[in-house]
Amino acid sequence: MRQIAARGAWALGLLALSSCATPAKRRGGDTHAAFLTLDAHLDTPVHFARTGWSFGDRRTYANDLAQLDIPRMADSGNLDGGFFVIFTDQGPLTAEGYSAARDFALKRSDEIDATIARFPERIGMARSAADARRLEAGGKLIAFKSIENSYPLGEDLSLLGEFHRRGVRLAGPVHGGTNQFAESATDKPRWNGLSPSGERWVAEMNRLGMVIDASHASDAAFDRLLALSKTPLVLSHSGTKAVFDHPRNLDDARIRKLAAAGGAICFTTIYLGALNMTPERAEVFGKHDQMGQMSSAEQADLTVRTRALDARQPMWSADFETYMAGLLHVIKVAGVDHVCFGADWDGGGGIAGLEDIEAHPKITARLRAAGYSWADLQKMWSGNLLRILQAAENGSGN
């Protein structure tokens, strides 16, 4: 959902650690900390190049714009890991645009690697489902890499292999604007779903053993991805039209088709209600992607401005109760074997009552109160993602 931040100007136009190891979780029992928890879409790498900011330092929602860090992940088992996103905003479909996007995406990939490498006793990179289990057994947090928007590949699908070599295991073809591969849910149709290059992209994703992410794809693109992929799809951060009718959300019929094909929808906190993108919000939010060029004092000032605006004028017209209603609906439609979590932390996600990852145990408690077992919760919090990742690995070479 990083287009909210990256397109602040666009929105305005529309409107006129320490060295100790993380303790291993106690498995079994009756708390959120009892099982492995993963999020399919973490935009936190946007913070990794910030001056004076460290992923290993504890922060709070009130005093920093980041919605997770290593200490908050480890506390009470809030979050054991997830897919750290290489996000690239959509640009022109030209050689120059592709080149700039490629360079940006490779740099962001390097920033993720460098950040995780600073804390080898606390978190590790994963390239497979087995890696995740190994890191879990060693009491470490887990970092996968993913691509949001395959625009940086340009017209050279061999670059997908390069990103795979660098550890990317999940990728989506498109983001906020229709590109060379697929139609965006929030842009005009062009390809009847996927372009010929997009169909080749699907085949290459399958050959490499990478999971296809259908979030941000139009309904027509979703249909083609589902029809063409030889392995199950994931929607890393999507919602349901039953709660809020928005192009980024999926209707019940498609959720059922996704489940029937073995895929999963990772329920999100965005587009559960209307987006309140006022001129003031667009101006402030548009600066978030510039944090890497800001001094620590400028970052602190932006945090104060953002949190004051959040209190006075929330960005989303939804709250924790809205979220739970949507989540319970998706579980009912898809089944516990086909639901996962992708809140869109640090990419525009977060709502009243669910502001950062420290609220994760509330979700587990409410699902338990709704009658879901610990086995159900284990599937939804990580098991389904790892199953789909393993299926993609098993299908590689085909």
Model-derived features with residue positions:
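Divalent metal-binding pocket/active-site signature
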Residues: 151-154, 165-249
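Bacterial N-terminal signal peptides
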Residues: 9-18
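N-terminal hydrophobic targeting/anchoring segments and the immediately downstream early-domain regions
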Residues: 21-191, 245-398
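Bacterial N-terminal signal peptides that target proteins for export
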Residues: 1-9
